[in-house]
Amino acid sequence: MSVHIEAKQGEIAESILLPGDPLRAKYIAETFLEDVTCYNNVRGMLGFTGTYKGKRVSVQGTGMGVPSISIYVNELIQSYGVKNLIRVGTCGAIQKDVKVRDVIIAMTACTDSNMNRLTFPGFDFAPTANFDLLKKAYDAGTEKGLHVRVGNVLTADVFYRESMDMVKKLGDYGVLAVEMETTALYTLAAKYGVNALSVLTVSDHIFTGEETTSEERQTTFNEMIEIALDAAIQQ
């Protein structure tokens, strides 16, 4: 057991999907996995282990934002030996040619969070995805005939911004979308020498106002989940 996860040793697979929403974790387990067991319900942050195409995989909710995902990633790696961590979540598009329900794979993540500046005073550490996981996820998506975008995303500390000027500027520099967790995941994976990836579905467009409902975000976006699972079981 760890502080926030009540699983016993051996109950969590080496490869794990990390949705922010614990109800999405439940949906993934019930929809895509077989022989499922629930190993965590601490603070309602559900975690499950099962099999996908005959291979063992887990799924764990992380909550929203850099501080919350950092708790679960630290504990999954340090206490349970997880080696491959794939975030599956939503993001808001900031490029005109990125549409709602498009799939984005984050190659790296810029951020306004102070997490890395506290670790690297005076430097801006650039965390990146694991290339093997990225390629496997990209190939899985293209084999399904999907238009998968790969590039930079913004990991933001603030959901409700007073000004969108900086977001617009980042878009001018090619950043594809905004989310709230990837930079923490990639930085911790680098610290501990494990593999990480973020596979994201565009749930809304920051500038056009197009959006999906909360129910759709929780129980659809299956293509993103299948891409992540296919990549996870190949590691």
Swiss-Prot record:
InterPro entries named among the record's database cross-references: DeoD-type, Nucleoside_phosphorylase_CS, Nucleoside_phosphorylase_d, Nucleoside_phosphorylase_sf
Binding site for phosphate: G20, R24, R43, R87, V88, G89, T90
Listed EC numbers: 2.4.2.1
Residue(s) at site: Important for catalytic activity: R217
Database matches in CDD domains: PNP_EcPNPI-like
Taxonomic superkingdom: Bacteria
Catalysed reactions, as listed in the record: a purine D-ribonucleoside + phosphate = a purine nucleobase + alpha-D-ribose 1-phosphate; a purine 2'-deoxy-D-ribonucleoside + phosphate = a purine nucleobase + 2-deoxy-alpha-D-ribose 1-phosphate
One cellular component term from this protein's GO annotations in UniProt: cytosol
Gene3D superfamilies reported for this sequence: Nucleoside phosphorylase domain
Key words of the record: Glycosyltransferase, Transferase
GO biological process: one example: purine nucleoside catabolic process
Record: active site: D204 (proton donor)
Positions of a purine D-ribonucleoside binding: H4, E162, E179, M180, E181, S203, D204
Gene Ontology terms, MF aspect: purine-nucleoside phosphorylase activity
Complexes and interactors: Homohexamer; trimer of homodimers.
Similarity comment text for this entry: Belongs to the PNP/UDP phosphorylase family.
Annotated function: Catalyzes the reversible phosphorolytic breakdown of the N-glycosidic bond in the beta-(deoxy)ribonucleoside molecules, with the formation of the corresponding free purine bases and pentose-1-phosphate.
Name the UniProt record assigns to this protein: Purine nucleoside phosphorylase DeoD-type
